[in-house]
Swiss-Prot record:
GO terms for cellular component: cytosol. Heterododecamer (2C3:3R2) of six catalytic PyrB chains organized as two trimers (C3), and six regulatory PyrI chains organized as three dimers (R2). It comes from the Bacteria. The gene is pyrB. Belongs to the aspartate/ornithine carbamoyltransferase superfamily. ATCase family. Catalyzes the condensation of carbamoyl phosphate and aspartate to form carbamoyl aspartate and inorganic phosphate, the committed step in the de novo pyrimidine nucleotide biosynthesis pathway. This is Aspartate carbamoyltransferase catalytic subunit.
Amino acid sequence: MAFKHKDIIGLQDLTREEIELLLSTAENLKEINSREIKKVPTLRGKTVVNLFYEASTRTRTSFEIAAKRLSADTINITASTSSVTKGETLSDTARNVLAMNPDIIVMRHAVSGAHHYLAKRVSCSVINAGDGAHEHPSQGLLDMLTMRQQFGKLEGLKVAIVGDITHSRVARSDIYGLTRMGANVFLAGPPTMMPPGIERLGNVTVCKDMREAVADADVVMMLRIQLERQGKTLLPTMKEYSRYFGLNQSVLKLAKKDAMVMHPGPINRGVELSSDVADGSQSHILKQVENGVAVRMSMLYHVSGGELPTE
């Protein structure tokens, strides 16, 4: 099937079939990353602009590597080195970038909805690399790919997501994607970090106790506390947070024996999870990073008009 969207703003906008297409393509493209020469001519002659208004290590680097492995030209623009520091608006930045005729803009922005605003004003494709606390679709896709590689399916899995749900765009993309693919999502976190009505996003159960969420889970996804998005301190101390919502070996034993431990990064060791869990045999955190390149290759491929041959 052909991917019918010009942009990828969020997993909320995609059907189950479209998510499946992006994941299947990522699995096929992943083989390129293990070749001696890690490059194919798929996007030769295309230009990808990485426009990042927020700090990023994994996502920006991963998108740049993904574009280059598809033979696209890449341009990296960060807020600190652009005219944004001189007061230029997003609209003016977009118009100036568009005048250079890029084919795809990959953007991260602190304001939720910024990508909808941009996509309506440019003719090229727009990929959301994270907008405020709204969505982070590439992270949601790579999380699902990592789970599917481990279990061979997403349907019926119990996925526990623990931490700062209110301020996490990763949590929202994971919820949209996982529930659409038939997984059962259980959330746990401090009451001050659990948004009201979150259950309406899909097949979601909110647990007051982390242990309830983790019990018999196939996947335990730990989230970072988003201090930079909090207007005020929502926790007495980090030590208290770790006591009630940190993942250690004792809590992990409540999950299934083959349960996966995941984290979108960056990790705060000793807060969200202990080092022995982060570095243990059940940790798939580095596998998530590895899968990120293939997933972002898939996203770039499909918004540029790529289509897999049908049987």
